A protein has these predicted regions:
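Short alpha-helix within the catalytic core of nucleotide-sugar-dependent glycosyltransferases
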Residues: 37, 42, 191-192, 223, ...
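Conserved alpha-helical elements of sugar-nucleotide-dependent glycosyltransferases
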Residues: 15, 190, 247
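Hydrophobic alpha-helix immediately C-terminal to the catalytic Tyr-X-X-X-Lys motif of short-chain
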Residues: 154, 158, 162, 194, ...
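A glycine/serine/threonine-rich, flexible loop-to-helix segment
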Residues: 129, 185-193
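N-terminal Rossmann-like NAD(P)+-binding domain of SDR-like oxidoreductases, especially those catalyzing
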Residues: 1-178, 220, 295, 303, ...
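Residue-level signature of the cytosolic catalytic core of signaling kinases
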Residues: 49, 143, 183-187, 244, ...
Length: 313
């Protein structure tokens, strides 16, 4: 397979850094653009001595200038956890709008392919279960989650507009809940939050009854699916996630057992617009990409808990 020069925005984040590692190991050259608003320098430090890796510190809402040819532009930059996009609501909207416009403009100027990292949040609090790519969603545009949900929905619309009117070769991946090593303990996502509370002998905080469900995909499976989408010719959105569903209450119990810790659970009021269920229909990924997750959830959880135990909290 031909070696590509890839520009990856948000490459210092959790997903972006795993994808950078994967692409470098495949023999591609990767230029990461990140402003560290939520990404971390330590996530990309392991690549600093790799001749195929380049880093540019920049806000992608500003014009992006890259010297030389580019084969693929991957737009992963965005605050993605509730804590982050509630803290940076304007930046979240700007990176979804201006950041997507600038990265699409780069792809257009370089005659490069383009992939947008979208999200299951475009489905909002779904009234259809599981969610397939034809479902338009159930989103409150002015609710607290709206800044992220609508930023990604706009980014998808802009991507398809560039595909149709500028003939840009585009891809859209709708990423469902993903977990694994290198997650920030303070990013507000449920798995690192529960692990941190458990390892610190703090009570585990469950919002609502804990009967609400999520589906969690291990990060190596996600990256593998994204790469298959990159190499495909499919331009419509594709769900990538693990359809294995688990309640938040069961998740807390599993983390306690995995960490060999006694747990105390504290219930708090459910946040506004928090979805009751989230589960991907991955029929398209199976049929178009021949992709399905390989890592069993409990195995991935064990690897993640052990990583957190090996790194200071």
């Amino acid at each position: 397979m031909e070696k590509m020069r890839i520009v990856l925005t948000g490459g210092a984040g959790f997903l972006g850094s795993h994808l950078t590692d994967f692409l470098l190991k495949k023999g591609h050259s990767v230029t990461v653009i990140d402003n560290f608003i939520t990404g971390r320098r330590e996530n990309i430090e392991p690549f600093s001595n790799d001749a195929a890796f380049t880093f540019i510190r920049q806000d992608v809402t500003k014009h992006i200038n890259i010297e030389g040819g580019v084969d693929f532009v991957l737009h992963f930059a965005s605050p993605a956890s509730p804590i982050d996009y509630l803290k940076f609501p304007i930046q979240t909207l700007k990176v979804g709008a201006l950041g997507t416009l600038n990265t699409l403009g780069l792809a257009k100027a370089k005659h490069a392919r383009f992939l947008l990292a979208s999200t299951s949040e475009v489905y909002g609090d779904p009234e259809v279960h599981p969610q397939n790519e034809d479902y338009w969603g159930h989103v409150n545009p002015i609710g607290p989650r709206g800044v992220y949900d609508e930023a990604k929905r706009f980014a998808e619309a802009l991507t398809m507009a560039y595909h149709k009117f500028h003939n840009i070769d585009t891809r859209i991946v709708r990423i469902f809940n993903t977990f694994g090593p290198h997650m920030r303990k303070d990013d507000g996502r449920v798995i690192p939050t529960f692990i941190g509370q458990c390892l610190n002998d703090e009570p585990i905080t469950i919002f609502g009854t804990g009967e609400q469900t999520r589906s969690f995909c291990f990060v190596s499976d996600l990256v593998r699916g994204i790469y298959r989408l990159m190499l495909s010719n499919y331009c419509n959105p594709v769900n990538i996630g693990n359809p294995e569903e688990i309640s938040i209450k069961t998740l807390a119990e599993l983390i306690g057992r995995t960490a060999n810790k006694k747990m105390r659970i504290v219930h708090k009021e459910l946040p506004e617009d928090d979805p009751q269920c989230r589960k991907p229909d991955i029929t398209t990924a199976k049929n178009v990409l021949s992709w399905s997750p390989k890592i069993v959830f409990r195995d991935g959880l064990d690897m993640t808990v052990r990583w957190f135990m090996d790194h200071s909290l």
